[in-house]
């Protein structure tokens, strides 16, 4: 090109794009570290308890149905009658008609190396009623029934986390829980065999039991078609209410939260995937913030290069492309330092140290050319890093804040260069 400024601008633009390669590599490193963190957390959960889902209890009554088939036929002019006794084994499942849950959850952390998993211990109390229909009798006119010992089944997704299961009280008597659901409709959980329960002449059976359950990340309850009320309390200030049903009311404070749910049987419909769920999450996770911060790499390097170009034009300084490259690499190193330090110190402290190191390095590199330039860039980069930190901390307003920042920077450039004679600067050099 005939104009050296245009040629240099093109070179600097290519340099900025080239510096996206190390920034992209750092983003890949963040994803790799996040995957390793997830593996460590999953390993801790394997030994403590995974995400837990507890289903409403239901009564399982095995029975034998007996009936007689009478076959009449005429043989040699005589009517003969043959009676055949038939029997089959079946299961009657009676879901709870109403369940009240009380859940008190305490959270803790366990570490594996530098990675930490958020775990919980839940004290769960359940009480309710199971309706026994009229057909649960010994005869119905055409068939005879032999009823075996019923059992109460409670589905629990990860039985490893069951720390204690006190005896269930059903119909005024107590029965011990046994491992496993012992029912084809549940894959994991507990059951209690009700030996000698006289359910034939009862319209409803009251029940109650208590569980001590350990898990990680989230806790959910499945109503399974029952009228359900839930009162939950936990010492975690950042709950995420998930599942099919949101709480009717909740109160969230610095020391934790309380929440209450009311779900009717008409809303629940008995589906296992329709749950009341709470996830114990960070509002903005560490690796999520690191990944979001690395997305601003192009903005940081591009704005710094543009500031250098403007300074070169307005102050008539000579800044070599190598200097652009070195400053750009220092800016890229910020994200690597941030990733490495945050795993040990936390995001806030790591951000402050990485910012201080990079601003000090770039300012020291520029101070020999001009103290004023070094001070200007040091203050400008510090302000830029401060704005970025605010954007990262405010997930809901990050787009709005970023848009306003770019608009303010564009306005500053436009107003600051109103008197610049761009034709004179970019005119081809005379021979």
Regions found by a protein language model. Give the residues of each.
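Hydrophobic alpha-helical transmembrane signal-anchor segments
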Residues: 2-28, 32
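Intrinsically disordered or highly flexible coil/loop and linker segments, enriched in small
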Residues: 50-54, 135, 396, 422
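Soluble non-transmembrane domains of integral membrane proteins
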Residues: 35, 39, 46, 56, ...
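Cytosolic-side membrane-insertion boundary helix
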Residues: 272-301, 320
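Generic detector of multi-pass transmembrane helix bundles and their immediately adjacent loops
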Residues: 298-431
